Design a protein with these regions (language model features):
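Short beta-strand/turn micro-motifs composed of small residues
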Residues: 10, 76, 161
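Conserved small/polar residues in nucleotide/adenosyl-binding loops
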Residues: 164-166
């Protein structure tokens, strides 16, 4: 509250709380839902970037080019998971014109949840390698998990694929 928050989220009833709070079933799910709603209200284009390797470098290059013409917000560092993506979305302001969002996963279903928040206009897949095989099985599993991003690609959106295999 000292940082200026109007309320906090809690998964339990806070007896004798001297600050406003919202009781939720899951704090993480609530944060993701709020981020999804907030980004939809801003109605700015989103570039969603995923892949086995090269996500951060690709994000940096794309954001560098876009910032020459547009006020661009990009994922800081590799805040690319189910908590990091919403935290990035919360940094967006009305004056931002485009968001470049990195999305990293290690299991099936994660990309669907990230893409639901981002709803990208452009999807970039850097490559499909052999990362996270412990949960995804093989390269085909990685491909299946990464391409979950397409479930929430905006109508008339664009897809950029790398033809380089690792």
């Amino acid at each position: 509250m000292e940082a200026g928050a109007l309320a906090t989220l809690s998964e339990r009833i806070l007896e004798n709380a001297d600050f406003p709070y919202i009781k939720v079933e899951s704090s993480l799910q609530a944060v993701k839902d709020i981020a999804e709603f907030y980004l939809q209200q801003l109605q700015i284009p989103v570039v969603g970037i995923t892949g086995s390797v090269g996500k951060t470098s690709t994000k940096e290059v794309i954001a560098s080019v876009l910032k020459e013409k547009y006020r661009t917000l990009k994922t800081q560092g590799n805040f690319n998971n189910e908590l990091g993506l919403p935290l990035t979305v919360f940094r967006l302001r009305d004056e931002d014109e485009i968001a470049v969002l990195e999305m990293g996963i290690s299991d099936f279903g994660e990309m669907t949840r990230l893409a639901k928040i981002a709803r990208p206009n452009t999807c970039v897949i850097t490559n499909i390698g052999t990362c996270h095989l412990e949960n995804l099985g093989d390269r085909d599993g990685v491909l299946k998990a990464k391409t979950e991003i397409f479930k929430y690609l905006q109508k008339d959106g664009h897809i950029v694929l790398s033809l380089i295999h690792i």
